[in-house]
């Protein structure tokens, strides 16, 4: 079954997601017990994202050796990027690990780009002089978010927006 959560940022954490699915506030649970033994409705539960299940299906179909042959020496397989922001063709893109930021920008139709935020608001901001860097564990690991900012954007305002986002989305357990 596929369930749609409430959409809160904290619900990306597995136990907060389970709380949300149970109709409660999406707050992380104390552990132990872990979801694998006491998860959704106190039943054994596995929580994975769609990308993991998609990769597992391809591995089951084509074999682990095939999958390991995609990507780089230290980052096997593919990565799904959710590309958004100042580009002509936002959307979901799947690349072999090792793709450069410049390649992604070309594919999504980004022009006059000053920066890319990789891995969402808690990730890193990469400036234009670093667009040769690669999406891979050995260079820029990512959770999949890829936000494009062109020259019209005030990067101070972008940073301020991220700070407001975290203030609003905080679950209240982390201290400043």
Where are these regions (language model features)?
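Short, well-ordered secondary-structure micro-motifs
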Residues: 13, 127-129, 160
């Amino acid at each position: 079954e596929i369930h749609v959560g409430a959409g809160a940022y904290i619900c990306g954490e597995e136990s907060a997601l389970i709380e949300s699915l149970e109709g409660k506030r999406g707050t992380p649970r104390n552990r132990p017990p872990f979801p694998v033994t006491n998860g959704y409705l106190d039943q054994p539960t596995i929580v994975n994202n769609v990308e993991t299940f998609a990769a597992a299906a391809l591995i089951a179909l084509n074999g682990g050796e095939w999958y390991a042959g995609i990507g780089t020496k230290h980052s096997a397989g593919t990565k799904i990027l959710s590309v958004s922001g100042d580009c002509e063709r936002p959307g979901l893109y799947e690349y072999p690990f090792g793709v450069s930021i410049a390649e992604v920008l070309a594919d999504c139709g980004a022009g006059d780009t000053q920066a890319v935020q990789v891995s969402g608001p808690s990730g890193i901001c990469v400036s234009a002089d670093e667009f040769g860097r690669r999406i891979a564990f050995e260079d820029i690991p990512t959770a999949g978010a890829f936000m494009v900012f062109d020259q019209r954007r005030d990067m101070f305002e972008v940073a301020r927006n991220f700070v407001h986002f975290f203030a609003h989305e905080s679950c209240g357990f982390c201290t400043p």
